[in-house]
Structure formats: C-alpha cells, structure tokens
UniProtKB/Swiss-Prot annotation:
Origin species: Escherichia coli (strain K12)
Protein name: UPF0380 protein YfjQ
Domain of life: Bacteria
Family to which the UniProt record says this protein belongs: Belongs to the UPF0380 family.
InterPro entries for the chain: DUF932
C-alpha cells in the first residue's frame, strides 16, 4: 500500500456543519496561513500559502468544513507543520453521504500537496477515504502550484462517479455470515497485527445503530470501519487482562486504516461479483 507523505499524530482539529470561517481556521490550524517556507527549504522550493490555494478553491465552489494540523513540540515548526482540510461542494456540507476532497500539505518539506477522494457519512460522523484504485493527486512545491492544485481538485471530483458506482454495487451484495467474519478477521489483523487481536470479529461486526443492521457489503464495511476507528470495545490484552480498544486519533493512522478497509471491501466485491 502506498504510504501517504503525512504522518499526523494527535492533532488540533475543528469540524462544523457549515463552511469554516477564517477566524476558526487561524485559531486551530495556523499553518494554513504560514507566510513563508520553513528555513530548511531550498531556493527551488515554490512557496504558496495553503490559504491562497483555499481562496482559489473557494472561488471554484469548494468549502472547508473540517481542518486539523499536527501538534508539534518545537514552536518554530507550528507555523509550517502538516495540515489537512476536507472540502465539499457548496450546498453539500450537510448531506447524508457526501463526496469530499481531502487536501494534505506542509511547508517544512515533509509532504507535497496531496488530494484524495473521500466520502462523509453523516449517520456516524465518519469520513471515509476511498482506496488506491481511484488514485490520488500529488503536486510538488515547484512550478505553477495553484493551477495544478485546482486542476487536481477537478480530477478528484471526476473520480466520484466511479466511487458511487462501487458504493451502489457494495450495497446490492449481501454477505453470508462466514464472509462477514472473514472480512472482519482481515480488518482485525491489519489493525492489530497477526499475533494478538484484543477483540473478536463479532464485536467489530456489531452495529452501533439500527441503520447499520443490514448485511450488505457496504453496511458491513461501515460497521467494521466505525468500530475500529472509534474504539472503546472491551477485550483482552496479550496477557489476558481486561482492556478497551483505543480510538484511532492520529490523522495519518485514520487515513491509512480507512484506505486499507476500502481496499479489502473492494477486493471482496471483485471476488464475489
């Protein structure tokens, strides 16, 4: 699996059911407004503040509703650290299942601009990251960055029709219990490793609300994703002691797990169709 350039740990974040204001962004993700590249960057580094790109994207009708940046110990890096914005088309911010553009960036040389296709599911407040088969857009810090990022945003938008086709196909495919268990086992192994999984397949297949009781592939995938991302499930550690699974709070870990689960669901769809 391709590794994202981002390595978010615990992050400052903000989410609203409307476009975020400049004041909200500045308070929570100051690196979006950074006025200069980090001192470690060379002369060839093309510096474009993320806020300038956001201004251009907003003129094209994309609005941020979620933003976060990595917490750093060195205050000198706070204005340049990695950050992530999730953008939607104006008028779609409060939809039930909404396509998103996920924009990742930093100004300390740790990542290029990256844009990924995503989907937000309102019923569980989870953001999905669609798998590698749909690709991603990377824009290095050189040349005409603004035009490339805007072009990339439309390229990501063009992917969503295929994403929705996959979603519809997953919704139409019912999974017998043994297949659900196999998918859950693969997800547990990815999340916790092969040696020990603190919870069972049945636990991560358990729905948290009545809307998720269906046994189609799409809903089964949603249940697994939410239970692994949100954590809080009671289980046993490797020594047999009581434990609870932790939520996935690091943004990079969230993105990687999300993408892995999508690939698993997509692979299963291909095998069973």
């Amino acid at each position: 699996m391709t590794r994202l350039a981002s390595r978010f740990g615990a992050a400052n974040l903000i989410r609203r059911d409307r476009p975020l204001t400049r004041e909200e962004l500045f308070r929570v993700v100051p690196s979006v407004f950074s006025e200069d590249k980090h001192e470690s960057r060379s002369e060839r580094y093309t510096y474009i503040p993320t806020i300038s790109l956001l201004d251009s994207l907003q003129r094209e009708g994309f609005q941020p509703f979620f933003a976060c940046q990595t917490r750093v110990r060195d205050p000198r890096r706070r204005e340049h650290t990695k950050h992530m914005l999730r953008l939607r088309r104006e008028g779609q911010i409060t939809g039930k299942q909404v396509p998103e553009i996920i924009l990742l960036n930093s100004h300390d040389g740790t990542s290029s601009y990256q844009m990924l296709p995503g989907m937000f599911r309102a019923v569980c407040q989870n953001g999905l990251v669609c798998g590698e088969s749909f690709g991603e857009v990377r824009v290095p810090h050189k040349g005409d960055v603004v035009s490339q990022v805007i072009e990339g945003a439309y390229e990501v938008l063009g992917i969503f029709e295929r994403v929705e086709e996959k979603r519809d196909a997953m919704q139409s495919l019912l999974l017998p219990p043994p297949v659900q268990q196999a998918l859950a086992k693969a997800a547990l192994t990815y999340r916790f490793g092969e040696d020990h999984q603190p919870v069972t397949e049945s636990q991560i297949l358990s729905p948290r609300r009545w809307q998720d009781e269906s046994n189609d592939l799409w809903t089964t995938y949603q249940r697994i994703q939410e239970n692994l991302i949100k954590g809080g499930l009671s289980g046993r550690n490797a020594k047999g002691g009581r434990t609870h699974t932790r939520a996935v709070r690091g943004i990079d870990g969230d993105v990687k797990l999300n993408r892995a689960l999508w690939v698993m669901a997509e692979t299963l769809l291909t095998q069973l169709q």
